[in-house]
């Protein structure tokens, strides 16, 4: 496994891979890797000749400076995990390599609508940062496929739209959420949880299951369902942030013709803002 930190060296290897006709898969990450990331790697390995994992804590997508500062950085441990998984390349650039002139005045990629709705409304600028860095990685690495986790449901929808709108010839693969045995979705931010909070954390998944059962049963009193869910979360020790029930295919409000719903949940537990989602097939 080769660790690449500079753009010239990356471009050199990408040119060689293209000349050799290799099928390249990209797994973009911010590091602090867990089993969910490893599932992305496994999916990439099954679909391509060469797997490149990027590790870059992207300052452009953080809406709070304190969150950027304390985001876990575990490059050595991450590389050890990826080496065991027989990843071919790790691209781990410094911030100055990606943004040599700083963020002020940086050209950015914005995806209208999806960037500012739902999660984007509560985290201004976040998705603009995501689409910009992913676009830069696509331009640099020129992958045939790229793997993203379905845990970040809105992010995956945003990337798919960006790829379509910008005419990238890249297959976007969504990989299902990986959960702990108690249902908690794996996330780098779980590291912020204390031992006591970790015991409480699966409550978010349980509340989503309760919402799903109501939707499957035909209940469409969405505001009432959401209000009850928020109350349940607060009683469990969370601070409910945002719960939405949307059309899974458009992320717009549910209509009578919606075939699938997605429950999008975000809640604070101590210093950790946990997000999760669950899709439900609706009775027609």
From Swiss-Prot:
Any one GO CC term of this protein is:
cytosol
Q: What is the lineage of its organism?
A: Bacteria, Pseudomonadati, Pseudomonadota, Gammaproteobacteria, Enterobacterales
Further facts: The reaction proceeds by a bi uni uni bi ping pong mechanism.
Catalytic residues (positions) = 37 (proton donor)
Q: What is its EC number?
A: 6.3.2.1
Task: Alphabetically list the UniProt keywords.
Answer: ATP-binding, Cytoplasm, Ligase, Nucleotide-binding, Pantothenate biosynthesis
> Where does this one sit in the cell?
Cytoplasm
Similarity comment: family membership: Belongs to the pantothenate synthetase family.
Q: Which InterPro entries match?
A: Cyt_trans-like, Pantoate_ligase, Pantoate_ligase_C, Rossmann-like_a/b/a_fold
Q: What does this protein do?
A: Catalyzes the condensation of pantoate with beta-alanine in an ATP-dependent reaction via a pantoyl-adenylate intermediate.
Residues that bind ATP = 30-37, 149-152, 178, 186-189
Q: Which organism is it from?
A: Salmonella typhimurium (strain LT2 / SGSC1412 / ATCC 700720)
Q: Encoded by which gene?
A: panC
Q: Which SUPFAM superfamilies match?
A: Nucleotidylyl transferase
Residues bound to (R)-pantoate are 61, 155
| HAMAP family, sorted | PanC
Q: Pfam families attached here?
A: Pantoate_ligase (PF02569)
What catalytic reaction does the record list? (R)-pantoate + beta-alanine + ATP = (R)-pantothenate + AMP + diphosphate + H(+)
Q: How does it assemble?
A: Homodimer.
The protein's name:
Pantothenate synthetase
Q: What's the top EC group for this one?
A: ligase
Q: In which pathway does it act?
A: Cofactor biosynthesis; (R)-pantothenate biosynthesis; (R)-pantothenate from (R)-pantoate and beta-alanine: step 1/1
């Amino acid at each position: 496994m080769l660790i690449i930190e500079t753009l010239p060296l990356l471009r050199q290897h990408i040119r060689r891979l293209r000349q050799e006709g290799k099928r390249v898969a990209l797994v973009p990450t911010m590091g602090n890797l867990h089993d969910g990331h490893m599932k992305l790697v496994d999916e990439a390995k099954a679909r391509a000749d060469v797997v490149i994992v990027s590790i870059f804590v992207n300052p452009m997508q953080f809406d709070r400076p304190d969150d950027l500062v304390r985001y876990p950085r575990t490059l050595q441990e991450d590389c050890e995990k990826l080496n065991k998984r027989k990843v071919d390349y790790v691209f781990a650039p410094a911030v100055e390599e990606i943004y040599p002139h700083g963020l002020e005045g940086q050209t950015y990629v914005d995806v209208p609508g999806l960037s500012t709705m739902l999660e984007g409304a509560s985290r201004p600028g976040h998705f603009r940062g995501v689409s910009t860095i992913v676009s830069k990685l696509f331009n640099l690495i020129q992958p045939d496929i790229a793997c993203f986790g379905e845990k970040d449901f809105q992010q995956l929808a945003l990337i798919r739209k960006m790829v379509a709108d910008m005419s990238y010839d890249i297959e976007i693969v969504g990989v299902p959420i990986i959960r702990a045995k108690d249902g908690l979705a794996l996330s780098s931010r779980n590291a912020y949880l204390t031992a006591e909070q970790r015991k409480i954390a699966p409550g978010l998944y349980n509340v989503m299951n309760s919402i799903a059962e109501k939707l499957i049963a035909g209940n469409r009193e969405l505001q009432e369902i959401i209000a009850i869910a928020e109350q349940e979360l607060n009683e469990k020790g969370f601070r409910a942030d945002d719960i939405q029930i949307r059309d899974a295919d458009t992320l717009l409000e549910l209509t009578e013709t919606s075939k699938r719903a997605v429950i999008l949940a975000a809640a604070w537990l101590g210093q950790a803002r946990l997000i999760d989602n669950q899709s439900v097939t609706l009775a027609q």
